Each structure stands twice: as C-alpha cells, then as structure tokens.
C-alpha cells in the first residue's frame, strides 16, 4: 500500500478541486483501521491543450477533527466517522464532507449509533459546523430511517444550495434493489443557511445481474453526485454483486418537476409522487475492465477546446485485489 507522511493512502471515497488554486482534495473512508479520519491534498496532471492525463501526486494530509478539536474515534465507537464525500465550497472557501454514520443491524447488533451528517471544516480539517439532518434521515436502533451503510454517500454544492443523497432506501421506503426490481432513495437539498429546502425521490436501478450463488451478497446504490447547475446533477450508481463484480453507470438527473417528499413517511415505488428524472450518460463497464469501486466525481480544469474535465475515481477498500483508479473525460454541456 502507498504511504504518505506515516499514513496509508487508500479508501479514497470522495474527490474535489479548488478551481482557483488547482488543488485537489481526496477524503479517505479509513475508520482508524490504519489512521484517523483524514483527507489528502494533491495534484492531477491534466494538460489543458491536449487533454492528456499523465499522473496523480499526493502533496499533503490533514486529520478531520470534532467540535472539541480531537480526531474522530475508530470504528465501533460512538461518534466514529465514515467519510464518503468531500466538496470544496468555492463560495465560502471551506470544505464540506459527508459522514455516512453507523448504526446496529441484525448482523452487527453491538454497533453504537454514530450520526450521519453533512459537516463543514476549514482547509486544515478543523470542524466549522454542520447542516441540520432531517428527522427522517437520522439513524436509529430500530428498523426505521436509513439502513446501515446507506447513509449520506454523495454530496454536491452550488451557489445557492447543498445537496446530499443517501446511498439506498430507508426501511420505510422499501427493500433494497434486486435483479428483478429497483428501489427508491432520497436526495435532500439545503439552502446556504443550512435549512432543508426539499427532499426528492431518486429511483434506483434494479441490479444488472443476479448474484452467483443466488443467495450471494449484493450492495448497490448511489455512490456520488456532482452538480451541473442548480437543478441538474451527475450521479454514479454502483453495484457490487457476488460472483459478478462491480457494475457502475453514470446518469444525469434533473430535479425540475419532482415532488417534494420531505413530509412523506414512506415512498412506495408506485406511489403518488414524481421522482427526479434520470438519463443514462455512460455505462462505465464499457471502459477499462475490470470495473472498480467507483465512488468519486469531480470537475477538473476546462480544456482549451471549451470542454470540461470530468474526473471519476475509485475507492480501493484497502484491498490488495482492488486499485485506486482515476479516469478523466472531456465532456460538453457542463457548467
């Protein structure tokens, strides 16, 4: 495994870029297995003229701290952090990060509650505040609210809003996706003052294949979102299927016309509400196989021809069988 300043570099679950300085930020979802919760700074070598992407360098590391200035405790402890996304907020000059939190379930009954939250920090990792989590997205010890590992996973920032998506369905919103049917998760929008402005249903795809054996494990949902403008976002839907591997699709979603479901206790798939619309942009399985655990989306530098650079990154899960992969694409129609 790669190391930097006595830390293990891995588990990179979110990336973003400061467009003013060109500095990149990479958050690790290490839950103190190796080191405390942290983010790295770095550089991506992308030629604005040719579009060639030739390398990645880590240049710094900072520990995420709590209100009292101490690092977050490790896995299995109250207040343990599970960082899943990071955004540079160019309108405030600070960083935002998504903490998926943790909770007990039938397989892990002794895990204590760690709150899911969208938090702010300065460029040194010091806590600066957090958004108010809607009551329907608070983690519990019962079969209510988000399931374990289905808390805040994707995060996006615009001039007027902060948006986060939970990876998969709440208990009340129905079962998780299977090869026969999809599911519904929730996308929440806050105003810049931290008040919830709305919540919208996001229709998740069914699994692209059945597990092998049929009773095998699966894990699927939204792994990241990225703002195009105030209403449109890119969304990564990622599935891991036992006996099949990873499958990832990139969608464009649009909130316009969607029903605000903030006050709805449950979202049946055929309910009387309108979800966000989604359009397939690319099946990422058509690129470099085998498909990795793609969890990151960020805008890179604008190219000389006017296209935006879209960077998609993977989380290696600190597993020698997987890799940290960064892919860059030239895209049109961006902000």
Protein language model regions, located:
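Sequence/structural signature of beta-propeller domains
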Residues: 1-335
